[in-house]
Amino acid sequence: MSVVENQDGWWGEGDDMFFVDGERLPSINGTGSEDYFLGAWDFGGKPFAYGLFGAPIVGAELEGGRWSVYRFHLDSPIPFTKALRATIEHGHANDRGDNFYSVAYWYQTEPHAAFPVLPASEMRLPRVFPAARAQK
């Protein structure tokens, strides 16, 4: 996941939540983004990278700060049958307006039913509101 901060301060207090197979309440409710990415206490203020988790880009806690973090669940899978929804709050109590970007990988066994048609690409692309300092 990558983050571009649109305001000063720490972006990483948003809780991670995993909703399995249509749950109304999450089966997994974490304690903060930095904990989910296994880098508590602001990732130690410096980049790090391991096989299953890391923070290769650690920016300043300022408007325009850029961060990139990752975690692979090879050693801690989250099983589901029909659906898995993963969310991360944008700051504690969803009180931040930063830009978050993410990607998820899933390994499909064969055979499988046909997948639904994806919306047009212009409908799937995020609307980006760049931070003022990031443009300087």
Regions found by a protein language model. Give the residues of each.
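Beta-strand-centric surfaces of beta-sandwich/beta-rich domains
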Residues: 1-136
